[in-house]
Amino acid sequence: MKIRNRHQRMVAAPPERIAALIADFDRAWPTEIAPAPRRQGHRLYDAGPMLWEEFDRPGAARAFRVVRPEGFQGEHWFELELAEGATVLRHTVEGCAVGKYEAIWRERIEPLHDLILEALLDNVDAAVASGD
């Protein structure tokens, strides 16, 4: 099953400011929903049952490839697009789920992912508004 999921928000700040907020998961991650991914080595992040490898993707502020579980293949990334007086912060997931992971994505992971991403965008907005 193909997966494509996108969230975006117009944020009243320059791209550099937003890049600094998403460079460290602890600053914007909604820990009231789920623990922030933890660095495991140089470019690996442990997010509970998922393991991500950070990689360089042209045009992306941050990008990750799914390492585990094997039933998911794909990437997710943050992009920053300059807009008039603001920046569009966009997060995209593209990949596929196979076997039992099709139902796991639809029933558990996608709804949680949507909650986390919308809360993360709220946290970025709040940090910008407060001058954090």
Residue ranges and their predicted role:
Residues M1-G41:
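Hydrophobic ligand-binding cavity/cleft-lining segments
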Residues K2-M10, A61, Q73-E75, A86-R90:
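Intrinsic-disorder/low-complexity, polar/charged segments enriched in Ser/Thr/Lys/Arg/Asp/Glu/Gln
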Residues H7-R9, M50-D56, E75-L82, V93:
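Hydrophobic/aromatic beta-strand elements that line small-molecule binding cavities or substrate pockets
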Residues A12-E16, F55-G59, E79-V88, G131:
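A short, structured loop/turn motif at beta-sheet edges
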Residues E32-M50, L115-A119:
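Short, structured interface segments that constitute the first stable element of a domain
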Residues G41-A47, R62-P69:
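Short beta-strand segments that buttress and anchor functional surface loops
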Residues R68-A126, D132:
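Beta-strand/loop substructures that line and gate deep hydrophobic ligand-binding cavities in soluble
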